[in-house]
Amino acid sequence: MTQPSCPCGSGDPLDDCCGRYHQGHPAPTAEALMRSRYSAYALGLVDYLRDTTLPAQQAGLDLDGIRAWSHGSTWLGLEVENHEVLGGQPEHARVTFVARWHDADGEHAHRECSGFVQRNGRWYFLDPTVALKLGRNDPCPCGAGGKLKKCCGPWIT
């Protein structure tokens, strides 16, 4: 039996692509995590979307809204425009992409440059829509030990 293709657009079977990350294997790059998150939206894997967001931001996610958007949309495709590893301790990266979907209001395209941070061997999405009540000189919520302004601050403040 033929496995379904991965929604991320790689052309690979789901189990050989994003499916392995959905099952708990860490994504090796920020781009792989971003692709797996797009696939999670297409497949309705809201817990995965929560778990791959920076832990300090997870409580602020609107999981019901994410679930409604995920299930109420037909996911049409993903185009990765750029993946840039920024380095640093912890390592940061950004991925620029266009996601396309169709819902009750028609077809949509969303272009975004997303930030990611790697902690303890796992990449996390830095969600700019989830506010953190932190000052620029407070410790960064990624747990690296540095100040927010020098670490993840440019992505989440």
From Swiss-Prot:
It comes from the Bacteria. Gene3D superfamilies: 3.10.450.50. Pfam families: SEC-C, YchJ_M-like. InterPro entries: NTF2-like_dom_sf, SEC_C_motif, UPF0225, YchJ-like_M. Belongs to the UPF0225 family. PANTHER family: ADENYLATE CYCLASE-ASSOCIATED CAP C-TERMINAL DOMAIN-CONTAINING PROTEIN (PTHR33747:SF1), UPF0225 PROTEIN SCO1677 (PTHR33747). This is UPF0225 protein PA1039.
